[in-house]
Amino acid sequence: MWPFRKKQTLKESGFFRGFTDWHCHILPDVDDGVQTMDEALQILGEYERLGVKEVWLTPHIMEDMPNTTQHLRARFVELQSAYQGNIALNLASENMLDNLFEERLNKNDLLPIGKAGKHLLVETSYFNPPMDLQNILLRIKAKGYYPILAHPERYLYMNESDYQPVSYTHLTLPTTSRV
């Protein structure tokens, strides 16, 4: 009988009701994501209609997009002022593990993700890992952060053994647990 059931849209299904989006590029005009405030507000409006309750805005920070925490915070304040909805907005960043990240880590100039401020959303090149990946991850941990690897499915060069040296220091892969 299942082929004859009434089809539902995602909105009708309630699938996203109470949902938290932990990684998006909705903060306007800061990276390769949303470019205008109107577009950001339109997306947030659609999120509201779907029942999303919380969004973590995670713009890129990398040598090719050297956003500063001050600039991102200023853009975030602008979005908060323009957005009149009920979704809780939070600011973090998606950090490329490059030389700029190393500088920012040394200065503690970071935008962590999660209410406790102890997790860093990180990424690497899709083609090659950083030459010192294991030590970079260990330095992140030594600074009191837990790395969350964005897009692990894209790193075809990685396998389970690449995660072994830091697996006991809470390298976080996709999970349904709360951050």
Protein language model regions, located:
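An N-terminally biased module of ancient metal coordination in phosphate/nucleic-acid-related enzymes
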Residues: 1-86
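Short beta-strands and strand-loop turn motifs
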Residues: 24-28, 55-60, 121-123, 147-152, ...
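Extended substrate/RNA-proximal surfaces in nucleic-acid metabolism proteins
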Residues: 68-168
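Conserved small/polar residues in nucleotide/adenosyl-binding loops
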Residues: 169-175
